[in-house]
């Protein structure tokens, strides 16, 4: 089969005609988007292509045909190929992509590789889904026939299938099945997980049937015949039509209750059970056309399909075929899944017993398997044997042997051995035919190679030929060859040639080994070439180096002796370029001297000759001329043109060749000095501090350009200095004195040097502004003013008209405070102890002079400023000020400006008193009256004097904290103490105004707080009996925490013994009984005794009959038919105080003396009476029931009240 799929980005203009016009695909082509692509599917003759039309129906196209289809997303649809085929995506030069499905080449796999097991070629991700293609979801896959044991099962490939109607796609081979997971176990149990998922899905479903049971599947299945068939019926869709189980489903309500959901689940389970029963009625398959490696299976639908439209299914969607080669009860593997009623099994093993059974599957419901049927494949020709092996050889004979291949059910009768008679590529001829597994060939040529191949034959036929193998006969060791001959020698290579040794036939294979000795110090030869050629080029050699070569010949029998040694030398290489020429000595107007060094790489030979070339460097003269040729490395040039640029380069010549030229060196000869310039002249008017000069270019006989000019100035003191040096014809000379005569002259400079100075020009500067004033003098007056005075500066050529004085706190804030002709000025209203600066500038008609130096000064200090912020700290930690806030106040203020003198102290005025404190911003006023208001103010003091007072503030002290109350013990118990303190009816403080802190002393003599609150009583629990405890108490109010009280010590009492259970009474012989009761251990060292009392008949008081430490007592002299009641209590006798503490009496135990004749009935009656008494509640139980009832009623009333209040 050969299917080609072509994809183009545009709609073809001429489409091939469709077969019978059955495929209505033109709407897709006409209405498609520009981004869509046209897919041309070529169907070959004898093939069938199935597609889904636009209306959902299936249409089959018989080949040959070319079907145009539209890809909406531009991707290639999936192509599922049959076994033994592969798909490839090919894009040609025109941009057309083709998916080619071709038979799988056997050369792509090693022997026995299961090439037919990959039904779907792994396509790219963009070939996954396409709406117009129907996926071949269920296909039969068969492994090839291989020799058992040639390849382990884990080497079978795991093919990847497209999504099917099952949860997990699988492909199962025929043998080597241990590496695959069976799918029969997936259907052996009911699908519990799917039932649970479907129960959840039914809650949200309205009218749709179950999605997995009633879903229609129209997958095209390949069944081994190479054609597609439409499987399934259109009536089995999910809408409930046809004969499928969907007919049973009725319309459901839009809203369902939990009861309807349970009924749906039960109905669904019954439906699944009915479908399984129908599918389980399938009969065993029929076997036909049994061959050696293939067989045809066919089967009929399940029997229940013909039971009417409501009793059966219209058509099962698919079938599964399971195969076993381990016997009837062996392990079965699924080898086919599809909708066809026939299956063609291929790639079976010849002469092998197989068992096969079939399942019917409807969506996810699978029926029971049919009865297995067995068959045996036919025998066939043997497998291809392995190549024969060489057992023995001589100069004229070869002995071969081989192993028998797999006979495939028919015994091997003979073997066919063929050879080429030693003639390469001349065909094979038979040299042995027989049943033996060895063969000896004689009368062969020595040292000759022969090619053999083997085939096996049985009664069925002849196998294929084995791989070819070449065997050689023995021969003689070659004679010593002649020494190799030199063909040609290069810089890094040498080509050698040699001839075959004497006595060797032309057919004999001779291998030559060329050895080389690279280092003269190393006497060993190393192999450089091994082969059958008669020539060799040895590369990667050193230049101008001597090497030694020798040759050795060898064949299958051994090596010859080495030949004579050939000595040859590689050629030298051409030298490298010399170094760049360098100037040696000074350069003159007509010549200079140059030198150069030999090249770093001489190429392996001496350099006998150097060439020095020169050019004048002009664009017109671009040709180099040889100025020197010889062995020297320096040369002197003469008779050159002045002021001309020349370029020099050097090269060398040796036996290796001509080197490259070195880098060029540019050299310019010196020019002649320029002539005398004309005197400089003033450009414009002279200024008071500078003049602008200009001059002309001097005349020059050499024609060289002037590079620079030098201007010299002579001052009135006859001091000469250079004021300009540069290429311009004008300059500005500054920093001159006003009204002063200066003399100037100029000279020119070029490559030849300086020319003579010009004649002198005398120039007078204009009058200038005043000079810089000296720093002004600053003095302070007694009234706090500042007097500034200064002296007049020099003013060349004009009188000073005014002075300007600038004043400020720093240089950036200077402001003009005075301008006029006076030489002093007084500053007022300045800040005390402040930094100020000033500067002075003088003016005349010519302009303003420079500023004087900046003068800094500081005004004298004064008394401090008033305190701006004064406050009372209300909350201050007690650790900082331990005094009570009732008798002290904590003042805090901000430090005022000290006006240049550090603050020494502060005066605090309280109205009737005044105190002085040091330089601080916090002070505690002590020894004040509680609950008193004070008016406070403060002033600062420094060395200059006292500053003004601040504003008054009012502050009030707090009341005194409360005193601790008296602590008393209201009640004491064995494990608790109830303490009380103070008077709860006191009206000294308002309710909730006082808080008490009660502390208990622990074993480490430390007091720990056990209560804090407004209450006047507290009960301390979990104490130890008869133990002393120490307490103290503290009261706290808004005024603060009061002091702790003195320590009070209270002791707990001793505990009484516990209440005992009712005693047990046992009747003894005669008129006596014995009473038993439980014991109590000694209590903290105090012994425990017991008191037994009895109530006789109708007496109203108990009488004591025993007191002691024993837990039993006997009473005699009792009267029959008389009621006795016994009770017991424990008594604790305190050793330290001799006090006796008695516990509560136990419940009474009744006893009546019985006669022996009625003991049995009496016992029974006693048991019933005891039961009745046990059912009656005791006093404690009755009290607990009453408390529980009241608590329940309280909680109920609380809930009712809360409900009505919230409403």
Swiss-Prot record:
Modified residues (Phosphoserine): 208, 261, 396
SMART domains: FN3
Pfam families found in the cross-reference section: fn3 (PF00041)
Listed InterPro entries: E3_ligase_FN3/SPRY, FN3_dom, FN3_sf, Ig-like_fold
Region (Disordered) location: 184-213, 230-265
Gene3D superfamilies named in the record: Immunoglobulins
GO cellular component: endoplasmic reticulum; membrane
Main location: membrane
Subcellular localization: Membrane
Family to which this protein belongs: Belongs to the FNDC3 family.
Function: May be positive regulator of adipogenesis.
Protein name: Fibronectin type III domain-containing protein 3B
């Amino acid at each position: 089969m050969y299917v080609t799929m072509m994809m183009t980005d545009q709609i073809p203009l001429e489409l091939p005609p469709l077969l019978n016009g059955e495929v209505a695909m033109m709407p897709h082509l006409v209405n498609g988007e520009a981004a869509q692509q046209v897919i041309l599917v070529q169907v070959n003759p004898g093939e069938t292509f199935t597609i889904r039309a636009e209306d959902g129906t299936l249409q089959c196209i018989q080949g040959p045909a070319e079907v145009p289809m539209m890809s909406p997303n531009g991707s290639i649809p999936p192509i599922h190929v049959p076994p033994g085929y592969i798909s490839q995506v090919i894009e040609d030069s025109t941009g057309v992509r083709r998916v080619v499905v071709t038979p799988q080449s056997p050369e792509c796999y090693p022997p026995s590789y299961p090439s037919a097991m990959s039904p779907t070629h792994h396509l790219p991700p963009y070939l996954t889904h396409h709406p117009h293609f129907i996926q071949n979801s269920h296909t039969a896959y068969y492994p090839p026939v291989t020799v058992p044991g040639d390849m382990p099962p884990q080497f079978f490939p795991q093919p990847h299938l497209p999504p099917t109607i099952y949860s997990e796609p699988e492909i199962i081979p025929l043998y080597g099945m241990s590496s695959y997971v069976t799918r029969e176990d997936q259907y052996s149990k009911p699908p519990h997980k799917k039932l649970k998922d479907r129960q959840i899905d039914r809650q949200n479903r309205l009218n749709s049937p179950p999605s997995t049971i009633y879903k229609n599947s129209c997958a095209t299945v390949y069944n081994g015949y190479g054609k597609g068939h439409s499987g399934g019926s259109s009536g089995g869709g999910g809408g409930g039509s046809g004969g499928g189980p969907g007919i049973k489903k009725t319309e459901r309500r839009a809203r369902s209750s939990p009861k309807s959901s349970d009924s749906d689940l039960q109905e669904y389970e019954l439906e699944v059970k009915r479908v399984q029963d129908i599918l389980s009625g399938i009969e065993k398959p029929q076997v036909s056309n049994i061959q050696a490696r293939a067989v045809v299976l066919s089967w009929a639908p399940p029997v229940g399909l013909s039971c009417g439209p409501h009793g059966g299914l219209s058509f099962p969607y698919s079938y599964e075929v399971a195969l076993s080669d381990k016997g009837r009860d062996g392990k079965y593997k699924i080898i086919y899944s599809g909708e066809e009623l026939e299956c063609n099994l291929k790639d079976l093993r010849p002469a092998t017993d197989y068992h096969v059974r079939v399942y019917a599957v409807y969506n996810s419901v699978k029926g029971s398997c049919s009865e297995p049927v067995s068959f045996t494949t036919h025998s066939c020709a043997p497998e291809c044997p392995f190549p024969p092996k060489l057992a023995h050889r001589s100069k004229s004979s070869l002995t071969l042997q081989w192993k028998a291949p797999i006979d495939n059910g028919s015994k091997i009768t003979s073997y066919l051995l063929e050879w080429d008679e030693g003639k390469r590529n001349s065909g094979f001829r038979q040299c042995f035919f027989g049943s033996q597994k060895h063969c000896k060939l004689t009368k062969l040529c020595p040292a000759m190679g022969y090619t053999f191949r083997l085939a096996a034959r049985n009664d069925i036929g002849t196998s294929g030929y084995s791989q070819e193998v070449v065997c050689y006969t023995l021969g003689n060791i070659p004679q010593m060859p002649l020494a190799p001959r030199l063909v040609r020698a290069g810089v890094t290579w040498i080509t050698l040639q040699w001839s075959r040794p004497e006595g060797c036939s032309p057919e004999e294979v001779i291998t030559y080994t060329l050895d080389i000795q690279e280092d003269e110090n190393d006497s060993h030869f190393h192999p450089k070439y091994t082969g059958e050629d008669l020539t060799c080029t040895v590369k990667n050699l050193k230049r101008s180096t001597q090497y030694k070569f020798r040759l050795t010949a060898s064949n299958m029998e051994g090596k010859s002796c080495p030949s004579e040694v050939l000595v040859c030398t590689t050629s030298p290489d051409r030298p490298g370029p010399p170094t760049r020429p360098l100037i040696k000595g000074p350069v003159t107007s007509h010549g200079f001297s140059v030198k150069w060094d030999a090249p770093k790489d001489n190429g392996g030979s001496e350099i006998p000759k150097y060439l020095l070339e020169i050019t004048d460097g002009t664009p017109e003269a671009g040709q180099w001329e040889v100025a020197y040729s010889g062995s020297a490395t320096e040369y002197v040039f003469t008779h050159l043109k002045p002021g001309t640029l020349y370029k020099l380069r050097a090269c060398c010549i040796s036996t290796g060749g001509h080197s490259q030229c070195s880098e060029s060196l540019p050299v310019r000869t010196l020019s002649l000095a320029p002539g005398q310039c004309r005197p400089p002249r003033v450009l414009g008017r002279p200024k008071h501090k500078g003049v602008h000069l200009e001059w002309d270019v001097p005349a020059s006989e050499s024609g060289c350009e002037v590079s620079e000019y030098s201007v010299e100035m002579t001052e009135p003191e006859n001091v000469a200095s250079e004021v300009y040096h540069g290429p311009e014809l004008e300059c500005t000379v500054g920093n001159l004195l006003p009204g002063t005569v200066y003399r100037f002259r100029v000279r020119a400079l070029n490559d030849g040097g300086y020319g003579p100075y010009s004649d002198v020009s005398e120039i007078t500067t204009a009058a200038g502004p005043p000079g810089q004033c000296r720093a002004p003098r600053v003095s302070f007056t007694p009234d706090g003013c500042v007097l500034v005075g200064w002296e007049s500066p020099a003013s060349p050529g004009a009188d000073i008209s005014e002075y300007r004085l600038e004043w400020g706190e720093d240089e950036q804030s200077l402001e003009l405070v005075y301008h006029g002709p006076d030489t002093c000025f007084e500053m007022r209203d300045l800040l005390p102890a402040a930094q100020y600066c000033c500067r002075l500038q003088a003016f005349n008609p010519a302009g303003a002079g420079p500023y004087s130096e900046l003068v800094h000064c500081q005004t004298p200090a004064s008394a401090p400023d008033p305190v701006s912020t004064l406050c009372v700290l209300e909350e201050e930690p007690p650790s900082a000020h331990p005094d009570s806030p009732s008798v002290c106040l904590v003042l805090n203020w901000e430090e005022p400006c000290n006006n240049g003198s550090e603050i020494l102290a502060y005066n605090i005025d309280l109205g009737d008193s005044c105190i002085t404190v040091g330089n601080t911003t916090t002070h505690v006023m002590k020894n004040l009256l509680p609950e008193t208001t004070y008016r406070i103010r403060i002033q600062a003091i420094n060395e200059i004097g006292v500053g003004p007072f601040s504003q008054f503030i009012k502050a009030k002290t707090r009341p005194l904290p409360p005193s601790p109350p008296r602590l008393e013990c209201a009640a004491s118990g064995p494990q608790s103490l109830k303490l009380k303190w103070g008077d709860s009816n006191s009206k000294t403080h308002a309710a909730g105004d006082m808080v008490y802190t009660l502390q208990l002393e622990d074993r480490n003599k430390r007091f720990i707080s056990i209560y804090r609150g407004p209450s006047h009583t507290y009960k301390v629990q979990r104490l130890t009996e008869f133990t002393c405890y120490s307490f103290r108490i503290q009261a706290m109010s808004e005024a603060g925490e009061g002091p702790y009280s003195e320590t009070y010590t209270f002791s707990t009492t001793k505990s009484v013994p516990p209440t005992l259970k009712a005693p047990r009474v046992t009747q003894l012989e005669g008129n006596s009984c014995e009473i038993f009761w439980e014991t109590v251990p000694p209590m903290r060292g105090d012994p425990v005794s017991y008191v037994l009392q009895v109530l006789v008949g109708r007496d109203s008081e108990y009488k004591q009959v025993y007191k002691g430490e024993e837990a039993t007592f006997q009473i005699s002299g009792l009267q029959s038919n008389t009621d006795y009641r016994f009770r017991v209590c424990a008594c604790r006798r305190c050793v330290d105080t001799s006090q006796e503490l008695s516990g509560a009496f136990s419940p009474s135990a009744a006893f009546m003396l019985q006669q022996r004749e009625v003991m049995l009935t009496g016992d029974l009656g006693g048991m019933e009476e005891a039961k009745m008494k046990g059912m009656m509640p005791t006093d404690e139980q009755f009290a607990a029931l009453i408390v529980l009832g009241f608590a329940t009623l309280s909680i109920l009333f609380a809930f009712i009240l809360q409900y009505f209040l919230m409403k």
